[in-house]
Curated annotation (Swiss-Prot):
It comes from Xanthomonas euvesicatoria pv. vesicatoria (strain 85-10). The keyword Ribosomal protein applies. Belongs to the universal ribosomal protein uL18 family. This is Large ribosomal subunit protein uL18. The gene is rplR. Part of the 50S ribosomal subunit; part of the 5S rRNA/L5/L18/L25 subcomplex. Contacts the 5S and 23S rRNAs. This is one of the proteins that bind and probably mediate the attachment of the 5S RNA into the large ribosomal subunit, where it forms part of the central protuberance. InterPro entries: Ribosomal_uL18_bac-type, Ribosomal_uL18_bac/euk. Pfam families: Ribosomal_L18p. The keyword rRNA-binding applies. GO terms for cellular component: cytosolic large ribosomal subunit. Keywords: Ribonucleoprotein, Ribosomal protein, RNA-binding, rRNA-binding. GO terms for molecular function: 5S rRNA binding; structural constituent of ribosome.
Amino acid sequence: MSINKNIARLRRAKSTRAHIRELGVARLSVLRTGQHLYAQVFTADGSKVIAAANTLQADVKDGLKNGKNSDAAAKVGKLIAERAKAAGIEKVAFDRSGYRYHGRIKALADAAREGGLQF
């Protein structure tokens, strides 16, 4: 029985989100595509987006060759940390959406931690 990689990733993400919902803290969610990276901070109940950043935004694109490398992910991480702190959020749960903690996901998380987010 073979399982599609994306279906397996979505199953892992669903399980993680259930655990995060029980914690009752804001959630930093990441979406990775082939060309870009998106990050959003949701409220504890998941009903509202508090802050968002992605590689399509002009302030992230400046000085980058493309939006699909670790440098771009680090810029998104710093920007999401700034925006979350401006909204009054300092502690979040990191929802990596079933992706491995490696490469772009790790770069984003490290930059968000350097920016002052705790998770």
